[in-house]
């Protein structure tokens, strides 16, 4: 059996159908099973989220009978129950330790290209600490470190399309951080290839798309996908931070975006290996423009 966390996220939505169609027995750790859609009836469900990884009962229930863990779940903003550091770093360490104690054979973890303990953003620092814990485990582990992952209707693409309806497309700061965007379907295919491929061991893959684009260039590609040719306007990061923090204070967790999320768009996510790791798994990543135009 496979335990899948983050099944309702961008990568999870792409991966879950592939696992189900491949005949895998899946248990999904989710807060709201309704978000699993039609696949809800095809999987076992454990109610919970990253904030509940401190609860031993939740961990035991989630890992009962599990041979492989695929840990996709992540949080890029603080939640009422815990901070970003706890939701990404500590929760991963707890799940990993429980997996070791219950005899799980394989732990697949999603980190991020560029995640280091010295990165300025809290999310990347937490991911780096979690990755170090995973790589230090005694069980077989695979780390996937992707660049920015997108899908046709994910929240980031949807928000950018809505912003492109304005007379000018607003961007955070200089918008010159570089990325190698990779489609969620291509990422999911890499996971399937790893599951079906070589004997479990200690491996790490950097997953990147075929193009190196700045945040501004990605935003233009998204706008062009709905025939919106807009000039861009660069809003100073300090103003964005003040505005988003103000919105958060007024509406709380219902805020459409937070500064922690916006700040991530100033952090480069590029791999020196390009698409080599994905291609080694038999996946040739598609261009962002081609995916969004389909």
How does the language model describe each region?
Residues 2-24:
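N-terminal Rossmann NAD(P)H-binding glycine-rich loop of SDR-like oxidoreductase domains
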Residues 5, 29, 69-73, 107-113, ...:
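SDR active-site strand-loop-helix element
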Residues 15, 22, 117-228:
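Oxidoreductase cofactor-interface core, primarily capturing Rossmann-like NAD(P)-dependent enzymes
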Residues 24-31:
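Conserved glycine-rich Rossmann-like NAD(P)H-binding loop of the short-chain dehydrogenase/reductase
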Residues 34-38, 43-94, 98-101, 113-117:
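NAD(P)H-binding glycine-rich loop region in Rossmannoid oxidoreductase-like domains
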Residues 85-89, 108, 127:
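Short alpha-helix in the Rossmann-fold core of NAD(P)-dependent oxidoreductases
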Residues 101-106, 139:
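A short helix->loop->beta-strand "cap" motif at the edges of active sites that frequently abuts
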Residues 194-259, 268-294:
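Mid/C-terminal beta-alpha module of Rossmann-like enzyme folds, strongest
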């Amino acid at each position: 059996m496979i335990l899948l966390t983050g099944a309702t996220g961008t990568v999870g939505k792409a991966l879950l159908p592939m696992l189900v169609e491949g005949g895998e027995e899946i248990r999904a750790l989710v807060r709201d099973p309704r978000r699993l859609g039609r696949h809800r009836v095809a999987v076992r469900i454990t109610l919970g989220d990253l904030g509940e990884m401190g609860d031993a009962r939740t961990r035991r229930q989630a890992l009962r009978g599990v041979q492989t863990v695929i840990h996709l779940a992540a949080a890029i903003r603080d939640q009422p129950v815990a901070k970003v550091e706890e939701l990404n770093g500590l929760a991963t360490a707890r799940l990993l330790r429980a997996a070791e104690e219950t005899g799980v054979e394989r732990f697949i973890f999603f980190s991020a290209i560029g995640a280091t303990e010295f990165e300025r953003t809290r999310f990347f620092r937490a991911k780096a600490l979690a990755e170090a814990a995973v790589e230090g485990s005694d069980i077989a582990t695979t780390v996937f470190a992707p660049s920015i992952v997108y899908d046709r209707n994910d929240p980031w693409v949807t928000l950018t399309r809505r912003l492109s309806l304005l007379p000018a497309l607003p961007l955070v700061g200089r918008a010159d951080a570089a990325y190698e965007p990779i489609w969620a379907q291509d990422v999911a295919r890499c996971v399937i290839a790893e599951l079906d491929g070589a004997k479990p061991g200690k491996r790490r893959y950097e997953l990147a798309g075929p193009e190196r684009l700045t945040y501004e260039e990605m935003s233009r590609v998204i706008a062009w996908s709905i025939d919106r040719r807009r000039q861009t306007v660069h809003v100073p990061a300090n103003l964005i931070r003040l505005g988003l923090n103000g919105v958060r204070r007024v509406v709380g967790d219902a805020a459409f975006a937070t500064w922690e999320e916006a700040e991530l768009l100033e952090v480069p996510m590029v791999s020196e290996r390009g698409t080599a790791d994905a291609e080694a798994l038999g996946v040739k990543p598609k261009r962002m423009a081609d995916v969004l135009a389909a």
